[in-house]
Design a protein with these regions (language model features):
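Hydrophobic ligand-binding cavity/cleft-lining segments
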Residues: 2-70
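Short beta-strand micro-motifs in enzyme catalytic cores
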Residues: 24-26, 100, 127
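Beta-strand residues in well-ordered beta-sheet regions across diverse protein folds
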Residues: 29, 103, 130-132
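Hydrophobic-ligand binding "helix-grip"
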Residues: 79-123
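Beta-strand/loop substructures that line and gate deep hydrophobic ligand-binding cavities in soluble
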Residues: 107-147
Protein backbone atom coordinates (compact mmCIF):
# COMPACT_ATOMS: atom_id res chain seq x y z
CA UNK A 1 0.00 0.00 0.00
CA UNK A 2 1.32 3.43 -0.97
CA UNK A 3 1.18 5.99 1.82
CA UNK A 4 1.96 9.68 1.85
CA UNK A 5 4.62 10.31 4.50
CA UNK A 6 6.77 13.16 5.77
CA UNK A 7 9.87 13.97 3.76
CA UNK A 8 12.57 11.75 5.32
CA UNK A 9 15.07 13.90 7.22
CA UNK A 10 17.91 11.53 6.24
CA UNK A 11 17.21 12.05 2.53
CA UNK A 12 19.61 14.26 0.59
CA UNK A 13 16.63 16.05 -0.99
CA UNK A 14 15.51 17.34 2.42
CA UNK A 15 18.23 19.99 2.15
CA UNK A 16 18.53 20.23 -1.64
CA UNK A 17 17.17 23.78 -1.83
CA UNK A 18 16.97 26.72 0.59
CA UNK A 19 13.26 27.00 -0.18
CA UNK A 20 10.83 24.51 -1.66
CA UNK A 21 7.60 25.20 -3.49
CA UNK A 22 6.69 21.51 -3.32
CA UNK A 23 7.99 18.77 -1.05
CA UNK A 24 6.23 15.43 -0.82
CA UNK A 25 7.04 11.82 -0.15
CA UNK A 26 5.28 8.51 -0.72
CA UNK A 27 6.32 5.22 0.83
CA UNK A 28 5.70 1.55 0.13
CA UNK A 29 6.90 -1.55 1.94
CA UNK A 30 9.15 -3.82 -0.09
CA UNK A 31 8.95 -7.61 0.18
CA UNK A 32 11.73 -9.10 2.29
CA UNK A 33 13.33 -10.77 -0.76
CA UNK A 34 13.44 -7.66 -2.94
CA UNK A 35 16.48 -5.67 -3.94
CA UNK A 36 17.36 -2.74 -1.72
CA UNK A 37 19.67 -1.18 -4.30
CA UNK A 38 18.16 2.27 -4.93
CA UNK A 39 19.62 2.45 -8.46
CA UNK A 40 18.04 -0.89 -9.40
CA UNK A 41 14.73 0.13 -7.83
CA UNK A 42 14.67 3.53 -9.56
CA UNK A 43 15.35 1.99 -12.96
CA UNK A 44 12.63 -0.58 -12.32
CA UNK A 45 10.01 1.98 -11.22
CA UNK A 46 10.54 4.10 -14.33
CA UNK A 47 10.60 1.09 -16.67
CA UNK A 48 7.21 -0.30 -15.61
CA UNK A 49 5.13 2.87 -15.25
CA UNK A 50 1.51 2.68 -16.40
CA UNK A 51 1.09 3.58 -20.08
CA UNK A 52 -1.18 6.54 -19.29
CA UNK A 53 1.83 8.30 -17.73
CA UNK A 54 3.58 8.29 -21.12
CA UNK A 55 0.47 9.78 -22.73
CA UNK A 56 0.31 12.47 -20.04
CA UNK A 57 4.01 13.23 -20.57
CA UNK A 58 3.38 13.68 -24.31
CA UNK A 59 0.63 16.22 -23.57
CA UNK A 60 2.93 18.02 -21.13
CA UNK A 61 5.73 18.11 -23.71
CA UNK A 62 3.45 19.57 -26.38
CA UNK A 63 2.45 22.39 -24.03
CA UNK A 64 5.82 23.24 -22.46
CA UNK A 65 7.82 23.14 -25.70
CA UNK A 66 6.21 26.45 -26.65
CA UNK A 67 7.67 28.02 -23.50
CA UNK A 68 11.19 26.80 -24.26
CA UNK A 69 11.22 24.30 -21.39
CA UNK A 70 12.96 20.94 -21.48
CA UNK A 71 10.81 18.12 -22.82
CA UNK A 72 10.98 14.44 -21.94
CA UNK A 73 11.80 13.72 -25.58
CA UNK A 74 14.80 16.06 -25.40
CA UNK A 75 15.95 14.63 -22.06
CA UNK A 76 15.74 11.10 -23.47
CA UNK A 77 18.31 12.07 -26.11
CA UNK A 78 20.77 12.90 -23.32
CA UNK A 79 20.68 9.37 -21.89
CA UNK A 80 23.65 8.28 -24.00
CA UNK A 81 25.97 10.94 -22.51
CA UNK A 82 28.36 8.99 -20.28
CA UNK A 83 29.64 12.18 -18.62
CA UNK A 84 26.22 12.91 -17.11
CA UNK A 85 24.64 9.65 -15.91
CA UNK A 86 20.86 9.36 -16.12
CA UNK A 87 18.14 7.01 -14.98
CA UNK A 88 15.29 7.13 -17.46
CA UNK A 89 15.14 10.80 -18.46
CA UNK A 90 16.45 12.09 -15.14
CA UNK A 91 19.97 13.26 -14.37
CA UNK A 92 21.65 11.47 -11.45
CA UNK A 93 22.69 14.05 -8.85
CA UNK A 94 23.93 11.63 -6.21
CA UNK A 95 24.00 8.05 -5.04
CA UNK A 96 24.67 6.24 -1.81
CA UNK A 97 24.12 2.74 -0.52
CA UNK A 98 20.53 3.64 0.44
CA UNK A 99 19.55 6.48 -1.90
CA UNK A 100 19.70 7.75 -5.45
CA UNK A 101 18.89 11.40 -6.15
CA UNK A 102 17.64 12.34 -9.60
CA UNK A 103 16.39 15.60 -11.04
CA UNK A 104 16.76 18.37 -13.52
CA UNK A 105 17.45 22.10 -13.59
CA UNK A 106 15.49 24.30 -15.96
CA UNK A 107 14.82 28.00 -16.37
CA UNK A 108 11.45 27.85 -14.58
CA UNK A 109 12.28 25.42 -11.75
CA UNK A 110 14.71 22.85 -10.39
CA UNK A 111 13.60 19.55 -8.91
CA UNK A 112 15.06 16.55 -7.15
CA UNK A 113 13.60 13.07 -6.78
CA UNK A 114 14.89 10.64 -4.16
CA UNK A 115 14.48 6.88 -4.08
CA UNK A 116 15.46 5.95 -0.52
CA UNK A 117 15.50 2.48 1.07
CA UNK A 118 15.34 2.22 4.84
CA UNK A 119 14.76 -0.67 7.25
CA UNK A 120 11.09 -1.39 7.88
CA UNK A 121 9.36 -0.80 11.16
CA UNK A 122 8.87 -3.07 13.03
CA UNK A 123 12.14 -4.90 12.24
CA UNK A 124 12.09 -7.96 9.94
CA UNK A 125 9.08 -6.64 8.01
CA UNK A 126 10.95 -5.79 4.84
CA UNK A 127 12.39 -2.46 3.84
CA UNK A 128 10.60 0.79 3.07
CA UNK A 129 11.03 2.51 -0.26
CA UNK A 130 10.29 6.22 -0.11
CA UNK A 131 10.01 8.30 -3.27
CA UNK A 132 10.38 11.98 -2.40
CA UNK A 133 10.15 15.04 -4.62
CA UNK A 134 11.35 18.56 -3.85
CA UNK A 135 10.81 21.47 -6.26
CA UNK A 136 12.23 24.99 -6.17
CA UNK A 137 10.63 27.50 -8.55
CA UNK A 138 12.65 30.35 -10.06
CA UNK A 139 9.86 32.56 -11.34
CA UNK A 140 6.16 33.01 -12.08
CA UNK A 141 6.33 30.49 -14.93
CA UNK A 142 7.68 27.89 -12.51
CA UNK A 143 5.04 28.59 -9.88
CA UNK A 144 2.25 28.52 -12.49
CA UNK A 145 3.58 25.31 -14.01
CA UNK A 146 3.84 23.69 -10.59
CA UNK A 147 0.30 24.68 -9.59
CA UNK A 148 -1.03 22.96 -12.73
CA UNK A 149 1.19 19.89 -12.58
CA UNK A 150 1.22 19.14 -8.81
CA UNK A 151 -2.06 17.16 -8.67
CA UNK A 152 -0.92 15.05 -11.63
CA UNK A 153 2.52 14.59 -10.08
CA UNK A 154 1.05 13.04 -6.93
CA UNK A 155 -1.09 10.63 -8.95
CA UNK A 156 1.88 9.68 -11.15
CA UNK A 157 4.07 8.90 -8.12
CA UNK A 158 1.40 6.80 -6.40
CA UNK A 159 0.51 4.95 -9.62
CA UNK A 160 4.18 4.29 -10.39
CA UNK A 161 4.80 2.74 -6.97
CA UNK A 162 1.59 0.68 -7.16
CA UNK A 163 2.47 -0.56 -10.63
CA UNK A 164 5.98 -1.56 -9.56
CA UNK A 165 4.51 -3.54 -6.66
CA UNK A 166 1.93 -5.18 -8.94
CA UNK A 167 4.58 -6.21 -11.47
CA UNK A 168 6.82 -7.48 -8.67
CA UNK A 169 9.90 -5.77 -7.28
CA UNK A 170 13.29 -6.97 -8.52
CA UNK A 171 14.78 -9.64 -6.28
CA UNK A 172 17.91 -9.16 -4.20
CA UNK A 173 21.09 -10.52 -5.77
CA UNK A 174 22.14 -13.86 -4.35
Amino acid sequence: MVEQVALPSQSAVATAFKTANLADAFSIQLPSDSSINPDVLARFIFSVQPSWIGALTNVRDAIVAGFGLKTAKHLATLSSDATAPRISIFRVFGTSETEVVLGENDKHLDFRVSILCTPGSPPNTGNQLTLSTVVHCHNLLGRTYLSVIAPFHRQVVKASLRRAADVGWPKASA
